[in-house]
Amino acid sequence: MEEFQGYLELYRSQQHDFLYPLIFREYIYALAHDRGLNRSVLLDNVGYDKKSSLLIIKRLISRMYQQNHFLISVNDSNQNKFFGYNKNLYSQMISEGFAVIVEIPFSLRLVSSLKETETVKSYNLRSIHSIFPFFEDKFPHLNYASDVLIPYPIHLEILVQTLRYCVKDPSSLHLLRLFLHEYYNWNTLITPKKSIFAKSNQRLFLLLYNSYVCEYESILLFLRNQSNHLRLTSSGILFERIRFYEKIKYPVKEVFANDFPATLWFFKDPFIQYVRYQGKSILASKDTPLLMNKWKYYLVHFWQCHFYVWSQPGRIHINQLSKHSFDFLGYLSSIRPNISVVRSQLLENSFLMDNAMKKLDTLFPIIPMIGSLAKVKFCNTSGHPISKSSWADSSDSDIIDRFVRIGGNLSHYYSGSSKKKSLYRIKYILRLSCVKTLARKHKSTVRTFLKRLGPKLLDEFFTEEEQIFSLLFPRTSSTLKRFYRGRIWYLDILCINDLVNHE
């Protein structure tokens, strides 16, 4: 963040808040390269392109300075000389560098807001697990929840327009349009599953998508809080946004209705809660199903009117929390009653009272997880471990380290599961798959290989938390048993991994 502050202050004095000159600076691509190396994935570290080097960056910048290479051929865009043989590599480098540039205003705004609110350890708020304590606190008191699949954007210009309220640099926005229209097939961005959350896509597309989601969530939050303003900081930008929406076929008033106070009363619900991650969100309420249906059809109409996104009401499912479970962030969560018996005595009479309380139950999704392991060839579809043949050429230490890392990441992520038995089964599959892979490499049987190595191989699969607690407490102690049964939420999990994301 300090690097962003220094770089931007330098160019503010020279370029009048223009961001686009930064794309010609080498340190921008160095920042993008460092971010790529620091990505955390489950199976393998897929960082920035290994072919990237300082020489390639210098060559890329020199070609961008030559305007002839930046001209667009409308009739034959495949013959663009700018990319030439290294089209994919240069395209990746430009998009990641441009993403770093566009993120600068957002990063500076975040830093200033944290200083104003004096927020301590703000990185803890970024953890995925921080959502589940919110679930435990709020959801037992609610009755209905809607599973909302956010539709993918299909109109490029609307996405660019949503950025211009934060990036006040027309040249950067024009460069963004040029880059997206010329060097990317926009249809790949709106293809579900394989596009916007895939590893092959760039950080720039995620930034655009998050801006699109933030745009509609700002109005959703406005209706929820019944405030007198949107999230914008100036009324001039608010009027500019309204005029932009009025240029579209459907004006704003068709969504908000003519009587604005009546519209606010229409959505009045002090107990409604909203949670989102990636393309899925949950809207929960304590009110009746009638209000949930109002929100349902409002969202469908809003997406169609403002973003030209065709969304069907069937994409939003309304369920009763006490009877249905919901799948969110890899956990299968539900609300179940927790009945405790209390003995009360009044003078000489004693009686028993049932104290019923609702509790959030977070379960480990064993069947989808076995399906995910089967896709990457750790087991078959029935859950029987098999050898990972593609890893048989690696060294023994490398094979063991890969399996241990996968098992540790799964244990770390699913530490909040209410019942750990299913998690132990997955760890058993990984252990036996590791042994079979090593036995295959050494052309031996599993039984013979285990006799040769002994129990030390299986000890590698204990997580760091399990090792510490096993040293502090005996195996039979009640403290260790409560540790294995209890839920633990960690504040260092910043992304959801491939095996966890079963969709």
From Swiss-Prot:
The keyword Plastid applies. InterPro entries: Domain_X, Maturase_MatK, Maturase_MatK_N. This is Maturase K. GO terms for biological process: mRNA processing; RNA splicing; tRNA processing. Pfam families: Intron_maturas2 (PF01348), MatK_N (PF01824). Usually encoded in the trnK tRNA gene intron. Probably assists in splicing its own and other chloroplast group II introns. Belongs to the intron maturase 2 family. MatK subfamily. HAMAP family: MatK. One of its GO terms (cellular component) is chloroplast. It is found in: Plastid, Chloroplast. GO terms for molecular function: RNA binding. Keywords: Chloroplast, mRNA processing, Plastid, RNA-binding, tRNA processing. It comes from Rosa acicularis.
